[in-house]
Amino acid sequence: MLTAKETRDSFKNFFESKGHQIVPSAPMVIKDDPTLMFTNAGMNQFKDIILGNHPAKYHRVADSQKCLRVSGKHNDLEEVGHDTYHHTMFEMLGNWSFGDYFKKEAISWAWEYLVDVLKLNPEHLYATVFEGSPEEGLERDNEAASYWEQYLPKDHIINGNKHDNFWEMGDTGPCGPCSEIHIDLRPAEERAKISGRDLVNHDHPQVIEIWNLVFMQYNRKADSTLEPLPAKVIDTGMGFERLCMALQGKTSNYDTDVFQPLIKAIAQMAGTEYGKNEQNDIAMRVIADHIRTIAFSITDGQLPSNAKAGYVIRRILRRAVRYGYTFLGQKQAFMYKLLPVLIDSMGDAYPELIAQKELIEKVIKEEEESFLRTLETGIRLLDKTMADTKANGKTEISGKDAFTLYDTFGFPLDLTELILRENGMTVNVEEFDAEMQQQKQRARNAAAIETGDWIILKEGTTEFVGYDYTEYETSILRYRQVKQKNQTLYQIVLDYTPFYAESGGQVGDTGVLVNEFETIEVIDTKKENNLPIHITKKLPEHPEAPMMACVDTDKRAACAANHSATHLLDEALREVLGEHVEQKGSLVTPDSLRFDFSHFQKVTDEELRKVEHLVNAKIRANVPLQEHRNIPIEEAKELGAIALFGEKYGDHVRVIQFGSSIEFCGGTHVAATGNIGMVKIISESSVAAGVRRIEAYTGARVEEMLDTIQDTLSDLKALFNNAPDLGVAIRKYIDENAGLKKQVEDFMKEKEAAVKERLLKNVQEINGIKVIKFCLPMPAEVVKNIAFQLRGEITENLFFVAGTVDANKPMLTVMISDNLVAGGLKAGNLVKEAAKLIQGGGGGQPHFATAGGKNPDGLNAAVEKVLELAGI
């Protein structure tokens, strides 16, 4: 029986023997494709080749790719743990041909690998082929069927519809028929009862697809019509975990050696045993799956956060923590302890896990602890919601309240339902679902984008010349219209461009396209599938005419200064804080720079000052730029160049060197460090567990900041009569102010006591109720203190109502003793109604409530209204 490692190696070895170049997995987190957050298929890293944006370096390629499916149409998250085969992170084994072999070889080699190499029983295999689509003029894929007939009986070759057997990259782009290979893993007696043929593509857990062979031969246009693809592509994908299940004779992916080490470790932590309790088993499967996703995401540079891809990772982590909390009794952080087990099973194949172990553990542990605190907060809020609901004589909490818990505090619905059941209560699920759908619709509306077809003026690829030129003669290769948020923009592709496209944390260039007829403003430059896209608000009237591409040089120079400064900061931080410092992200704009780095505690003011001094010393030294352009990656490593985890580098790279600062980098930089002028750190903060952030200014922005500081200092000196020592003068002022504040507080306490005593002497007893009412100008905090003091002294039958004014703002305050609350009076209900008379609103607890308003003249009437509503 092959282990997971042996299976992965056998696939690569087989296709290497067929002339394929074995390439490493691309990062699971995608940084240069706005249409995707995560790699969700093996073909993602080859999109630019498939789309024709770049030539293929190798015409035959194979790999094992880390994938993540948790958003968009490829969203398996809610299935994970509840069945035997869905995962968030999974490995995709794949082989590709770019204009080389096609259907015959793809089918032949798939069969050879499965049957001859892996020794799978051919009698248990089925193949599907595209049945055709008359409405699109597409015939059945008889070519693929004829090749399958060389290996399979006809009753093992099944026609598949467009949904299952016609693969499309998206609404537009390359597409084509596909042929899926399915395997029947049922026992012999089950196979004898019903043919596997009848269960293919019917969601049977033991009759499953293991390999999809995609034959890309068409291009889908924006009007939905198809045209032939100039260079045909083979794109295959085989689920690694499913393959291991088939080879190891298991009925669940989670029973293979891919997951079992993790599941056993989880069971040991929880003091339970896998296979004894279905709900516990689901929890263990969820955690085993999710720890892989979280660890690899952090490794590839995506930290949990509250935005975009980071939010997805945080949701996955919290889902796992919640399952451990609810079903396995894990009330303390526990997931980070699974990392050694994961490294033991996957560290050889993915050494980046080992290199990033300390950071991964730190981030996961702090995220767990943070969410556990959130869970405790959510439970307290749910307790209050339950109490309020019961007080109103109900046993069902509103779906809106449950959604607020979910959306604001990350408190999952099923945990809410579990706690409610334990308290004999329910939740309005339909209302919750309606709130969820409204939120999703708002998100869809905000993200809706309509993209037209590319209008191709001439064939060709883009050459970036921006390292050497800021102006360059060019012509348009293609363009298209894009509509989003009621705005129409145009995307333009040039044959030569000096415009730097946003990447590596540096914002894209702006500028103009100019010819004798007109000037077109370029408002941004983005990168899609490694293709520079120039964004404009209008098209040239003569798009086929040559144009001069001119970059905004002031913006470019400012970006270059800030980008070079990040390199100097990176080196200085390692020198001051230690070699554990690694860049985790950056943002380079013309106005400022932001640099995120791994470090496990706050950087002290003294350390920041040392970093600043080191950077500015290097700036004063005016160290010249040494650019090593397009050098072999091994040569770059020999130079000592620093690479970023989570970045995918080609065989040839660009290295930027300022003396001892040597980094892989594709951005724009100053010719010498002196051009930066000066660096001033303006803030240091935490952005995630184990990750700190520095923000800084350079050059002219530093001068502006120093001017502002000098002006502020001058104003302060004037305020303190030009005191010779401003620090001493300010401290003296603070001390005097503290003394005066203490005197005021003492006076207010005396006033509170005097008011309270006067009120006690003027208690009105009405029908056995001790009523205290008044209208006075008084701060809200003083009224509250008096109310609670009176409640402490009059423990029964107290009814306190006060109308007060502070800074011309009216306030209504009601305090009721517990026995009156038990009798049916609710302070919150009373102030809510009476507050209308002061043009306001409010509420609170049954025994204490307040309401603010805009009309002080209505206070007396409001106080009387409270008494009237209370029946006093």
Curated annotation (Swiss-Prot):
The answer to whether the entry has keyword Lipid metabolism is no
| Cofactor dependency | Zn(2+)
* Record-level GO BP terms: alanyl-tRNA aminoacylation
Which keywords describe this protein according to UniProt?
Aminoacyl-tRNA synthetase, ATP-binding, Cytoplasm, Ligase, Metal-binding, Nucleotide-binding, Protein biosynthesis, RNA-binding, tRNA-binding, Zinc
One of the entry's Gene Ontology molecular-function terms is:
alanine-tRNA ligase activity
UniProt xrefs under Gene3D superfamilies? 2.40.30.130, 3.10.310.40, 3.30.54.20, Bira Bifunctional Protein, Domain 2, Threonyl-trna Synthetase, Chain A, domain 2
List the catalytic activities from the record.
tRNA(Ala) + L-alanine + ATP = L-alanyl-tRNA(Ala) + AMP + diphosphate
EC number(s) stated in the UniProt entry for this protein:
6.1.1.7
**Compartments, record wording:** Cytoplasm
This protein's GO CC annotations? cytoplasm
Q: What does the record note about the cofactor?
A: Binds 1 zinc ion per subunit.
Residues the entry annotates as binding Zn(2+): 563, 567, 665, 669
Q: What does this protein do?
A: Catalyzes the attachment of alanine to tRNA(Ala) in a two-step reaction: alanine is first activated by ATP to form Ala-AMP and then transferred to the acceptor end of tRNA(Ala). Also edits incorrectly charged Ser-tRNA(Ala) and Gly-tRNA(Ala) via its editing domain.
Domain comment? Consists of three domains; the N-terminal catalytic domain, the editing domain and the C-terminal C-Ala domain. The editing domain removes incorrectly charged amino acids, while the C-Ala domain, along with tRNA(Ala), serves as a bridge to cooperatively bring together the editing and aminoacylation centers thus stimulating deacylation of misacylated tRNAs.
Entries under PANTHER family matching the protein? ALANINE--TRNA LIGASE, CYTOPLASMIC, ALANYL-TRNA SYNTHETASE
Identify its protein family. Answer: Belongs to the class-II aminoacyl-tRNA synthetase family.
Q: Would you tell me the protein name for this molecule?
A: Alanine--tRNA ligase
Q: Which organism is it from?
A: Bacteroides fragilis (strain YCH46)
